């Protein structure tokens, strides 16, 4: 996983003082993610993804960050799934990273765009063969009569794509969350935690406003 984030992690933030001194939230994010990669037992790139349905009722689930840079945070999914449909309707989402081993969390809120077909194709071809077949076999979020039905679909697509590359399903791709708000939280004694909020008014704005928040 480190290789995917290498370009952002080269500007690693090391000291506690830099928590408040940094002016670039992506640099601080890269530093924290790199530390989490060392300290977290499983999936340091796991993040809670929050969306809302057409009635405004929220939904949240854990997904995996697959790439990030100064334009946003990328994950992949079935566009016909619940989360895919909710995002496509609102084009807004929120993320939370929580690293218990570091006693830190990051909240991200922003607008969403679809990744390019070329970007999605490249990532899909990097996935294990079984995961590629699963993307075809699973009608994500739809009702499943029993496990045998799913296994039959897996067998069917395994036979269909036994030779050569597995093409990316047309309904399977990625989203990029382009942040307007990024908040860093760090545990401190007596519940007097550190909170550092970066905001910008529009996506093209490169200069972030930085503010401290009461814990």
UniProtKB/Swiss-Prot annotation:
InterPro entries named in the record: Pyridox_Oxase (IPR000659), Pyridox_Oxase_CS (IPR019740), Pyridox_Oxase_N (IPR011576), Pyridoxamine_oxidase_dimer_C (IPR019576), Split_barrel_FMN-bd (IPR012349)
Gene Ontology BP annotations: pyridoxine biosynthetic process
Key word ATP-binding present: no
Pathway: Cofactor metabolism; pyridoxal 5'-phosphate salvage; pyridoxal 5'-phosphate from pyridoxamine 5'-phosphate: step 1/1; Cofactor metabolism; pyridoxal 5'-phosphate salvage; pyridoxal 5'-phosphate from pyridoxine 5'-phosphate: step 1/1
Keywords: Flavoprotein, FMN, Oxidoreductase, Pyridoxine biosynthesis
Entry EC no(s): 1.4.3.5
GO MF terms, alphabetically ordered: FMN binding; pyridoxamine phosphate oxidase activity
Family matches, as Pfam families: PNP_phzG_C, PNPOx_N
Top-level taxonomic group: Bacteria
Entries under SUPFAM superfamilies matching the protein: FMN-binding split barrel
Residues binding FMN: 61-66, 76-77, 83, 105, 140-141, 185, 195
Cofactor(s) listed: FMN
Keyword match Cell division: no
Catalytic function, reaction form: pyridoxamine 5'-phosphate + O2 + H2O = pyridoxal 5'-phosphate + H2O2 + NH4(+); pyridoxine 5'-phosphate + O2 = pyridoxal 5'-phosphate + H2O2
Broad enzyme group: oxidoreductase
Record's subunit section: Homodimer.
Family: Belongs to the pyridoxamine 5'-phosphate oxidase family.
Known role: Catalyzes the oxidation of either pyridoxine 5'-phosphate (PNP) or pyridoxamine 5'-phosphate (PMP) into pyridoxal 5'-phosphate (PLP).
Protein name listed in UniProt: Pyridoxine/pyridoxamine 5'-phosphate oxidase
